[in-house]
């Protein structure tokens, strides 16, 4: 006997993960490999370079050539003409050498180069040349004197003809910016004549007149000399003396690296 049976089937809903995987489209392109292979063209180029012939060095004598080349120079029949500008330059150099020998220089060491000696001379003589230089055909410098009284007169007595005649030039007072010092400073500027005989001696000394009392600084009796460059006597750079306390003083000779007034005649006054 036939029976009719009715049955219900239920399908579960797909999981969320399954739905996501279904949505992802599968790519047909293959992934790029991480290992790179060498290009075929590069390999072929390397092989071609290896097959090339290596360079070789050959000498000239192996090919029948000379190793040296000799050139013979003969004297010119005509004298070589020097361009005018070069000959003029040579003449100027010769003239500069002559002028260098003829120009005047100081023939003494700057008194203040040895400060202790300068101080002792000022203490003993009440006057001392401090520094001096030649500038533009003029003699300029400074003098230190003791402040013995208010009225003072300082002069430079100079001769241009070996003391056959002489001239006195007044020095100008230099105001002390600090004040209250027991020493005064005077400056001088003496113009040199245009023509001076080659054998004439140029010498000068410093005179200090204070209320009728006369004091002289004559460079210890030698006077301060000005000579031509060619007649200058070189000085021994090593000079040592001992002051009253027994200490050596010579920063110019023993310690030349210390700052002194050595070579001051080429630099200029500091005031």
Curated annotation (Swiss-Prot):
One of its GO terms (cellular component) is protein phosphatase type 1 complex. It holds the Pfam family CBM_21. One of its GO terms (biological process) is glycogen metabolic process. One of its GO terms (molecular function) is protein phosphatase 1 binding. It comes from the Eukaryota. Residues 119-227 form the CBM21 domain. Keywords: Carbohydrate metabolism, Glycogen metabolism. InterPro entries: CBM21_dom, CBM21_dom_sf, Pase-1_reg-su_3B/C/D_met, PP1_regulatory_subunit_3. Gene3D superfamilies: Carbohydrate binding type-21 domain. A motif (PP1-binding motif) lies at residues 56-59. Acts as a glycogen-targeting subunit for phosphatase PP1. Facilitates interaction of the PP1 with enzymes of the glycogen metabolism and regulates its activity. Suppresses the rate at which PP1 dephosphorylates (inactivates) glycogen phosphorylase and enhances the rate at which it activates glycogen synthase and therefore limits glycogen breakdown. The N-terminal region is required for binding to PP1, the central region is required for binding to glycogen and the C-terminal region is required for binding to PYGL. Interacts with glycogen, PPP1CC catalytic subunit of PP1 and PYGL. Associates with glycogen particles. Forms complexes with debranching enzyme, glycogen phosphorylase, glycogen synthase and phosphorylase kinase which is necessary for its regulation of PP1 activity. PANTHER family: PROTEIN PHOSPHATASE 1 REGULATORY SUBUNIT, PROTEIN PHOSPHATASE 1 REGULATORY SUBUNIT 3B. This is Protein phosphatase 1 regulatory subunit 3B-B. It comes from Xenopus laevis.
